[in-house]
Amino acid sequence: MANTLVGRKRIRKFFGKIKEVAEMPNLIEVQKASYDQFLMVDEPEGGRADEGLQSVFKSVFPISDFASTALLEFVRYTFEAPKYDVDECRQRGITFAAPLKVTLRLIVFDVDPDTQAKSVKDIKEQDVYMGDMPLMTENGTFIVNGTERVIVSQMHRSPGVFFDHDKGKTHSSGKLLFAARIIPYRGSWLDVEFDAKDIVHVRIDRKRKLPATSLLYALGLDGEEILSTFYNKVVYDRDGADWRVPFDAERMKGMKATVDLIDADSGEVVLEAGKKLNARNARQITEKGTKFLKATDEDLVGQYVAEDLVNAQTGEIWAEAGEEVTDKLLKSLEEVGITELPVLDIDHVNIGPYIRNTLAVDKNSNREGALFDIYRVMRPGEPPTLETAEAMFHSLFFDSERYDLSAVGRVKMNMRLDLDAADTVRTLRKEDMLAVVKALVELRDGKGEVDDIDHLGNRRVRSVGELMENQYRLGLLRMERAIRERMSQVDIDTVMPQDLINAKPAAAAVREFFGSSQLSQFMDQTNPLSEVTHKRRLSALGPGGLTRERAGFEVRDVHPTHYGRICPIETPEGPNIGLINSLATFARVNKYGFIETPFRRVRDGVVTDEVAYLSAMEEAKYYVAQANAQMDENRKLTEDLVVCRRAGEVIVVGPERVDLMDVSPKQLVSVAAALIPFLENDDANRALMGSNMQRQAVPLVRADAPFVGTGMEAVVARDSGAAIAARRAGIIDQVDATRIVIRATEEADANKPGVDIYRLQKFQRSNQSTCITQKPLVRVGEFVKKGEIIADGPSTEFGELALGRNVLVAFMPWNGYNFEDSILLSERIVKDDVFTSIHIEEFEVMARDTKLGPEEITRDIPNVSEEALKNLDEAGIVYIGAEVNAGDILVGKITPKGESPMTPEEKLLRAIFGEKASDVRDTSLRVPPGVTGTIVEVRVFNRHGVDKDERAQAIEREEIERLAKDRDDEQAILDRNTYARLADVLIGQAPVAGPKGFKKDTTLTRELINDYPRSQWWQFAVIDDRLMTEMEAMQKQYDESKKRLEQRFLDKVEKLQRGDELPPGVMKMVKVFVAVKRKIQPGDKMAGRHGNKGVVSRIVPIEDMPFLEDGTHADIVLNPLGVPSRMNVGQILETHLGWAAAGLGRKVSKAVDAYLKTQDIAPLREEMKAIYSPGELDGLTDEELAEAGNNVRRGVPMATPVFNGAKEADIEQMLEMAGLDRSAQSTLYDGRTGEPFDRKVTMGYIYMLKLHHLVDDKIHARSIGPYSLVTQQPLGGKAQFGGQRFGEMEVWALEAYGAAYTLQEMLTVKSDDVAGRTKVYEAIVRGDDTFEAGIPESFNVLVKEMRSLGLNVELTSSKKAANDQLEPPADAAE
């Protein structure tokens, strides 16, 4: 870390013992690599590979018309530059996308009417616009309609073949019924399954089942071939009254002899009944020379004939293949003199007669019948013909248009069934189906294992690119139908490709996917960690995945193959637990979509630095040692027995048998879990909460990196894109709060400018309304390398993730205020803005063109006092910096209302005073309840052709000035660099020509050259040709750069001045951003990193907080009872180490002060050398060391990586070094009495986060508000400004209490008695406090509903007098 610019400014002490050999992959590579592979924006030499977008076009094109007289071919595709850049898209609310142009070739044929021979008549090529394709931003997100979205990767079942059984649940006997299923990437599913009677059936697409032999018949096999495929043949030879059968040791090995085995030649008993034939006695029998065994007729009865026995002369069939051998059959065979009887090798123990039995029950006996049967199942009610049945069967599994196993499916199938088809064979073959049935029968015979569908070798990841590819294919297929029809309708000789294509379906498919797919999610942008985690998320839900209700326990559970691939900790609590997972830190996705994790190779017990990435299937073959296996200095494994994993089991083997070793202890957890120090000391449930709550931490006004970190903080800050990294090496030229200008020093590419300008985001709103703001970390003149952090973003400090603050905690009860996880805070926390955050709310208003006339944004609003307009400018828009409260006007807007007929008096008044205000109503944008803050930004959007108001013009002028400043700065640096290079070339030369007044052959010096204006330097001419060409090239490059710069500026200005694309009917739109400063207050939720969460119960004056002997007050008091039962001891260890870190910080602080006085760096260097590990301070200059020391005054930051961090001894050593008690407990004094507490208290620094559950967002009150239209009851919820529901149970409570009048009030005048509501109001205004309840509207709704069912209900009153007032129910609701 100390070798980067920012890393030198503050150095983190590292406790890790295990050296990491593998580089952690970029955290958002999953997204970027996948989408890049799909788009392939730049076409490589030799054309694009057949994947992604290219393969989609290739699979749909060429398209021919119905008569095959024309063909539309795909040539290539290209992307044009996007119209707007990322920031412009965000501001204007549009999608960041690039236009896709496809080159198509239309070939028209001439067909000879006699011979039907085709000849090419005409070929036309044209570029066709195919809609916009969304582009991914630098940070792996998409901008759709102005909001950032993430496409979450999906985990689904890998295509291929799976074998499984029903776990004995189907049949009452508990018998296992085996089944196989072939799952393609797209196409029909094929199931092969046993039933309780051991007959094999097939189902296609979960339809009605058929005997499996029907499928085999349909594949073209006949009965005899089916039997010979599945069974071996044994030939029995007549030997007098008995039979001779060949002795095959291999086949019979492991079988038990039911009768004595007798040698057919010698008559000797070679194996007694009841004994098992094992390798030893099989060898003995073979050595004796036994070739044949003796068999009797009894042995043959019950066997099955292997092939048809036919009389060659007459063609008479004596026995059919598969027929059972009976005494009767044997007799008849003896009579006709047959001495050889081939039977199937079925012993009912190791080999069962399942296929033979299936063949026997199958009513079909030929291909035609089988095809008809399959056709009837798939298309019931249609009469089959042989052609249609054959065509349908072919299209089910053998047609590449309809059926695609995908490369993955083929690879998986080859592995499972030991086949060797190339992975380009994407349809099923006859061999595949036979192999599946064979494997299934073998399973039933007890050979082999069923598959585990939760094994990560059987689940794969579909990332953005693949999801998008599938979606685009659907769009193109819809388009293809339209093109075919179009080609047949038009005169094909005169049209161009453009006229045939309507790209709407393709564009609509893309739009639908990004806008409304379950996997396209609104990005969680609360803080940088939540962004990274969202992009690394794996969901089992979504189209083609599981549903919450159907997912059982097994799918959600942690599986041994998750190790190093999927985090066992980070998953949501609740219904989605285990269905939404997170990728582990080192994991990556391979080309087949399987998750891989890295291992170090181990050879002969010696660990190498060679790293191999393996998927779950590949890993199963190896013995894998843990990352913490003990080694000597030569990396030889030292233990006699090493604990290893193999195929999901933990075993102990000798070091020479170890094949691989984990690369890092943190490779099994995800990014969020890897940020929890002392994770190994926390209970898993609490660690889960800890990793989930870090994602909800709100960025604070002042970020503060943790004293006790894990070393992952810098990685997350860099990869999330929150902190800005330098694109090229260079020297800082200018820095201010809004931008950093770097002069590039690496050899500049002629097309790139020699200067990089980084615009910093200032007070921008994130998706979750948190505040995104960046601040520079570099100073003018500093040199930065490529990739170094130059600016901090939200929740980062010195390029490290900083989600919360380090606060001084005391673990002790405090007058019940920290009962049940409540948190007690000191007033200092509020006063010093420790947990203050800024939230930016966005409000927008549109002025539309209505039927009655256009709405108008103006300051001139009827019946509004001047006081209410104090914050508006002359255009009626609030000015920046105004402080606004709930109800204040942000944008004045009036809407025309329909003219009502006027009375004569009104007409007269109107004629006299010209009063016009009555025909408009006030529809201004006001601040909603509960919001107070400062206006930080206003954006005004105008439709094309609508005149801009003064405010819009002012905003535009400001923006143009900013762009001009950027251009001028870039120009200045370009001038400086170019002319410096030119001066270097010219000085010392004696030009033969030059500007006016130059004497030729004068040797140029710097003073001489500076006498001329720089623009005239190009006029110097020297004799040296090489120098002249160099100067000319330099001048050309300079002129081009200058031109490009100016052009870029003009383009941007033109975009600004152009009108905006607004929704239809909208003339003008104004967006107002209000920044709300939220201090921490009782009711806010806070949490540590160990799942220790709580709600702030009280904020206590600092003088009442417990304090130490030196007068330091605790910032926060937590309840010690929150620790033991929750078993998250990590927080206590963190507190201890944080205490040591602060103590060491105090020591360094003293040394820095001494250095500032004496300017002697040696004592400071010694002090810091004692703290840090050897080598961590190497290469630091004195100034850098002093700066590093100054930056750790508050506490020396430490890194204790998960499973590889500080142990108790290390913590004690640090405490001693800091001069603190080894117990890390201190005597505390009660702030209110000044008395010491009886026992010492654990005190230290803990890292606390303020979560996004703020009381200000939840608290809500209503007096008068909106009512529901039908029921007339108040709406519910804060967003609707609703009331609190007085529900069924609350009614019971009032009934039980006997509070009849209160109850009546609740159910009528306070809810939905419309007339009663107004009467109550009038009575209260009059000062009268009696009122009567009427009929609630919900009663009328009920009556109306009953009437709609044809039940007439009428309300009659028993009181005669009351009848006059009560209207008949028919009109009650009107």
Swiss-Prot record:
It is an enzyme of class 2 (transferase). GO terms for molecular function: DNA binding; DNA-directed RNA polymerase activity; ribonucleoside binding. It catalyses: RNA(n) + a ribonucleoside 5'-triphosphate = RNA(n+1) + diphosphate. It comes from the Bacteria. GO terms for cellular component: DNA-directed RNA polymerase complex. InterPro entries: DNA-dir_RNA_pol_bsu_external_1 (IPR019462), DNA-dir_RNA_pol_su2 (IPR015712), DNA-dir_RNAP_su2_dom (IPR007120), DNA-dir_RNAP_su2_hyb_sf (IPR037033), RNA_pol_bsu_bac (IPR010243), RNA_pol_bsu_CS (IPR007121), RNA_pol_bsu_protrusion (IPR007644), RNA_pol_Rpb2_2 (IPR007642). One of its GO terms (biological process) is DNA-templated transcription. Its EC number is 2.7.7.6. Disulfide bonds: none annotated. Keywords: DNA-directed RNA polymerase, Nucleotidyltransferase, Transcription, Transferase. The RNAP catalytic core consists of 2 alpha, 1 beta, 1 beta' and 1 omega subunit. When a sigma factor is associated with the core the holoenzyme is formed, which can initiate transcription. Belongs to the RNA polymerase beta chain family. DNA-dependent RNA polymerase catalyzes the transcription of DNA into RNA using the four ribonucleoside triphosphates as substrates. PANTHER family: DNA-DIRECTED RNA POLYMERASE I SUBUNIT 2 (PTHR20856). This is DNA-directed RNA polymerase subunit beta. The gene is rpoB.
